[in-house]
From Swiss-Prot:
Cysteine disulfide partners in this protein: none
Quaternary state and interactors: Homodimer.
Family: Belongs to the phosphoglycerate mutase family. BPG-dependent PGAM subfamily.
Species in which this protein is naturally found: Ralstonia nicotianae (strain ATCC BAA-1114 / GMI1000)
Name of the protein in question: 2,3-bisphosphoglycerate-dependent phosphoglycerate mutase
Upper lineage: Bacteria, Pseudomonadati, Pseudomonadota, Betaproteobacteria, Burkholderiales
Length: 248
């Protein structure tokens, strides 16, 4: 049996301000740092260790991984930073307050933009200050791979090649892998692993800084999955994530 651990970054500054973030590179809050360190402690106390880590090229995920590794005394393990694990791109919503956007467009429209499988938000215009094309993180990527908006379907389409060519082979080779990423890149992986339908994925939320453990068989099919930590607190965190896109 293989184990894979997924952990969403701790609370970011724009999580705190209830803004759509996407590919904008904001940092962790003090609460987010504490969440990441608690995630590392939970993993250490449960007897986990890792041979290899994956994360995105955005500092809120990278720094979360650092704190997890520090708590586990695993700062030394190899880490792969991969743009394909970035949060989904929120296009023209990037930087906007979610509740204010819901007040303007309605809760249902914002729910569709946030959680539907195949409806992207309005796109940025190329060259907008929020457009990541030309950023050194994405040097060498063609224009078509640096999005101006994405839906979850688009996120799945960029995450799965990384899973198939790198992450899955690493796990099958016996490496113990942890992935520190984002709500929607993790939703993309969970959708694939658990074969969740396009309709049902709307209801899936991922809490900040909470280790999600997958036990996988030899073919990397899930045997079971579970969150580490206080289950009531996790339920409250999931409810808070679900409510972020509603008008106040």
């Amino acid at each position: 049996m293989h184990k894979l651990v997924l952990i969403r970054h701790g609370e970011s500054t724009w999580n705190l301000e209830n803004r759509f973030t996407g590919w904008v590179d904001v940092d962790l809050t003090d609460t987010g740092i504490a969440q990441a360190r608690q995630g590392g402690r939970l993993l250490r106390e449960a007897g986990f260790t890792f041979d290899l880590a994956y994360t995105s090229v955005l500092k809120r995920a990278i720094r979360t991984l650092w704190h997890v590794q520090d708590e586990m005394d695993l700062m030394w393990i190899p880490t792969r930073t991969e743009w394909r694990l970035n949060e989904r791109h929120y296009g023209g919503l990037s930087g906007l307050n979610k509740a204010e956007t819901a007040a303007q467009y309605g809760d249902q429209q914002v729910l569709v933009w946030r959680r539907s499988y195949d409806t992207p938000p309005p796109a940025l215009e190329a060259g907008d200050e929020r457009d990541a094309y030309g950023n050194p993180r994405y040097a060498g990527l063609p224009r078509e791979q640096v999005p101006l908006t994405e839906c979850l379907k688009d996120t799945v389409a960029r995450v799965l090649p990384l899973w198939e060519t790198s992450i899955a082979p690493d796990i099958k080779s016996g490496k113990r892998v942890v992935i520190a990423a984002h709500g929607n890149s993790i939703r993309a992986l969970v959708k694939y692993l658990d074969n969740i339908s396009d309709d049902d994925i709307v209801g899936l939320n991922i809490p900040n800084g909470t280790p999600l453990v997958y036990e996988l068989d030899a073919n990397l099919k899930p045997i079971r999955h579970y969150y580490l930590g206080d289950q009531e607190a996790i339920a409250a965190s999931l409810a808070a994530v679900a409510g972020q896109g509603k008008a106040k």
